[in-house]
Amino acid sequence: MNTATRVIVAQNVRTRNRTFQITKQGVVIVALVIALLCSAFGVVYFKDLNRRLFIQYQTLQREKAEELIQWGKLLLEQTTWSTQSRVQRIAEQQLGMQLPSAKEVILVNADAMIE
């Protein structure tokens, strides 16, 4: 082998057996890469969490609207069941009550009751 070939082969042998030294700069780079990956996974996780929570929020808003509609219907039904004519009809039919005549009505003076 000639001298030039020996030098090239010797350099290749040295680079193959090269040991890596842990330097402060290498540690910083590895730490930054790990921080970058954690940050990326965090962004993905929280975006997904935000999306799922927003869908849940919309579902709850829809349920609230449906419950308000149902509540309005129940209020209307309650008003219907408690109308004066219905109460009077049930009092007459089921309880045998009747409206008093004008002679049967007694007015009580509230001022006289206090004294």
UniProtKB/Swiss-Prot annotation:
Residues 47-115 are periplasmic. Its main location: membrane. Coiled coil: none annotated. InterPro entries: Cell_div_FtsL. Residues 1-25 are cytoplasmic. It is a single-pass type II membrane protein. It comes from the Bacteria. It is found in: Cell inner membrane. Keywords: Cell cycle, Cell division, Cell inner membrane, Cell membrane, Membrane, Transmembrane, Transmembrane helix. One of its GO terms (cellular component) is cell division site. The keyword Iron-sulfur does not apply. The chain crosses the membrane at residues 26-46. One of its GO terms (biological process) is FtsZ-dependent cytokinesis. Part of a complex composed of FtsB, FtsL and FtsQ. NCBIfam families: ftsL_broad. Essential cell division protein. May link together the upstream cell division proteins, which are predominantly cytoplasmic, with the downstream cell division proteins, which are predominantly periplasmic. Belongs to the FtsL family. This is Cell division protein FtsL. It comes from Coxiella burnetii (strain RSA 493 / Nine Mile phase I).
